[in-house]
């Protein structure tokens, strides 16, 4: 989860988020090197009296500044495409959960069970218990088994929403009349918080998401108690 005054990304909880974090560091290093080179060239031009105003043709330099940016773009594009395809890939999910966005709450349906569905509303500030987080707690958490591939089917009942959990590397639009898919796989148990990430009306900021990742045995006990 996020912390006050935190700089950088949240701790990765899923393999996809670990890949995204590595890609972020990879791209940031390229940006840093390019920025350093540009600043060095600018400072050299401003601090030296050595100038050459008679150059009419420099094919070697033009070749370098054409090939080098192309190579840099390839170094960015290849890992980006790899992660993009990984995010869409899912084989034999252990569980499927249908998520519907509403103004202004989420509803969840465990499609592998006959009567396991519920609505999830934000807990009012006046009802919070000690240690709970303002604007992030809900009355019904989404309980899921850890270390298993889970398919989330995401849509909306009214307007555009977006179902996002940063520590899992998830952000999928909820579009009326369209079913989008996302994959969840958590490396560890815990509570993971998210929010609606698409402006959807006056109470947009009051649509938190709470995932509770637990061992498979605990999930089976919870699902049996809910049916």
Curated annotation (Swiss-Prot):
Belongs to the cytochrome c oxidase subunit 2 family. Its EC number is 7.1.1.9. The keyword Translocase applies. The gene is MT-CO2. The chain crosses the membrane at residues 15-45, 60-87. This is Cytochrome c oxidase subunit 2. It is an enzyme of class 7 (translocase). Cu cation A1 binds at residues 161, 196, 200, 207. It is a multi-pass membrane protein. GO terms for biological process: ATP synthesis coupled electron transport. Keywords: Copper, Electron transport, Magnesium, Membrane, Metal-binding, Mitochondrion, Mitochondrion inner membrane, Respiratory chain, Translocase, Transmembrane, Transmembrane helix, Transport. Its cofactor is Cu cation. It catalyses: 4 Fe(II)-[cytochrome c] + O2 + 8 H(+)(in) = 4 Fe(III)-[cytochrome c] + 2 H2O + 4 H(+)(out). Component of the cytochrome c oxidase, the last enzyme in the mitochondrial electron transport chain which drives oxidative phosphorylation. The respiratory chain contains 3 multisubunit complexes succinate dehydrogenase (complex II, CII), ubiquinol-cytochrome c oxidoreductase (cytochrome b-c1 complex, complex III, CIII) and cytochrome c oxidase (complex IV, CIV), that cooperate to transfer electrons derived from NADH and succinate to molecular oxygen, creating an electrochemical gradient over the inner membrane that drives transmembrane transport and the ATP synthase. Residues 1-14, 88-227 are mitochondrial intermembrane. Cu cation A2 binds at residues 196, 198, 200, 204. InterPro entries: CcO_II (IPR045187), CcO_II-like_C (IPR002429), CcO_II_C (IPR034210), Copper_CuA (IPR001505), Cupredoxin (IPR008972), Cyt_c_oxidase_su2 (IPR014222), Cyt_c_oxidase_su2_TM_dom (IPR011759), Cyt_c_oxidase_su2_TM_sf (IPR036257). It comes from Acomys ignitus (Fiery spiny mouse). Its main location: mitochondrion. It holds the Pfam family COX2_TM. It is found in: Mitochondrion inner membrane. PROSITE patterns: COX2, COX2_CUA, COX2_TM. One of its GO terms (molecular function) is cytochrome-c oxidase activity. Component of the cytochrome c oxidase (complex IV, CIV), a multisubunit enzyme composed of 14 subunits. The complex is composed of a catalytic core of 3 subunits MT-CO1, MT-CO2 and MT-CO3, encoded in the mitochondrial DNA, and 11 supernumerary subunits COX4I, COX5A, COX5B, COX6A, COX6B, COX6C, COX7A, COX7B, COX7C, COX8 and NDUFA4, which are encoded in the nuclear genome. It comes from the Eukaryota. One of its GO terms (cellular component) is mitochondrial inner membrane. Mg(2+) binds at residue 198.
């Amino acid at each position: 989860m996020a912390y006050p005054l935190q700089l950088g990304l949240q701790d990765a909880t899923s393999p996809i988020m670990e890949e995204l974090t590595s890609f972020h560091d990879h791209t940031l290093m390229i940006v840093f090197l390019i920025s350093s080179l540009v600043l060095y060239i600018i400072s050299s031009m401003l601090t030296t009296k050595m100038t050459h105003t008679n150059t009419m043709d420099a094919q070697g330099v033009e070749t370098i500044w054409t090939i080098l940016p192309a190579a840099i773009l390839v170094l960015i594009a290849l890992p980006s495409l790899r992660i993009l395809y990984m995010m869409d890939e899912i084989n034999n999910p252990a569980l499927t959960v249908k998520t519907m966005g509403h103004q202004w709450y989420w509803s969840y349906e465990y499609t592998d069970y006959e009567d396991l569905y519920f609505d999830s509303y934000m807990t009012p500030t006046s009802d919070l218990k000690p240690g709970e987080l303002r604007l992030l707690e809900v009355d019904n958490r989404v309980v899921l088994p850890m270390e298993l591939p889970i398919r989330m089917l995401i849509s909306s009942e009214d307007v555009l929403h977006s179902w996002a959990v940063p520590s899992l590397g998830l952000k999928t639009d909820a579009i009326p009349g369209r079913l989008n898919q996302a994959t969840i796989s958590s490396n560890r148990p815990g509570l993971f918080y998210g929010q609606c990430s698409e402006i959807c009306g006056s109470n947009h900021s009051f649509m938190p998401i709470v995932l509770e990742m637990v061992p498979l045995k605990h999930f089976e006990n919870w699902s049996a108690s809910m049916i």
